[in-house]
């Protein structure tokens, strides 16, 4: 447990490096509130394993670092080919509302159709034409929100408790991961 008196309720870049090194959950006291952070792997450089470390896990862990906890869903590989629509069926129930793509801000979720007609891939919009995501058979990464990804984008979503400063928790992890390389 440590505190950020008068600071932000997210782990700093140094906090994230030390948390990863300790492999322990961290508790942060800020403005009289206790914020609990599971020790999740850095958001970039993760190996893909469907249902364990996939695009939803990245989305869930990024939001955790931003102070919003998301449920974990049991999901079989290729669920989108079996008539399921897990993202669209769960976004509103977990606190998200649909926004127009031009109004997307850093931290908003982009649902994409990746080799499917159903929204089966989630990415976190980072602003400045970048997204953070995790594709099968690749390491999780930041990349340009290119025309290819714009064509695949099904919809954009924002959490009802999101505020712009929450993206700091995600950025601090990205910076901490870069410093570790």
Residue ranges of predicted features:
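Short HxH-centered metal-ligating active-site micro-motif
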Residues: 1-13
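Divalent-metal-activated hydrolytic enzyme cores
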Residues: 19-41
């Amino acid at each position: 447990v440590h505190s950020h008196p008068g600071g932000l309720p997210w782990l700093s870049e140094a906090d994230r490096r030390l948390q990863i090194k300790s492999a322990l959950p961290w508790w942060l006291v800020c403005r009289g509130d206790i914020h609990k952070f599971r020790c999740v792997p850095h958001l970039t450089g993760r190996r893909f394993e469907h249902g364990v470390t996939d695009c939803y896990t990245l989305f869930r862990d990024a939001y955790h670092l931003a102070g919003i906890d998301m449920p974990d869903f049991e999901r079989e590989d290729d669920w989108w080919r079996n008539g399921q629509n897990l993202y669209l069926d769960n976004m509103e129930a977990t606190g998200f509302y649909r926004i127009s793509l031009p109004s997307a801000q850093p931290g908003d979720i982009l649902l994409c159709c990746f080799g499917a007609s159903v929204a089966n891939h989630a990415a976190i919009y980072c602003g400045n034409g970048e997204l953070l995501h995790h594709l099968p058979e690749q390491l999780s990464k930041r990349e340009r929100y290119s025309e290819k990804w714009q064509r695949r984008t099904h919809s954009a979503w924002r959490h009802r408790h999101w505020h712009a400063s929450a993206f700091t928790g995600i950025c601090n992890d990205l910076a901490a991961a870069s410093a570790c390389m």
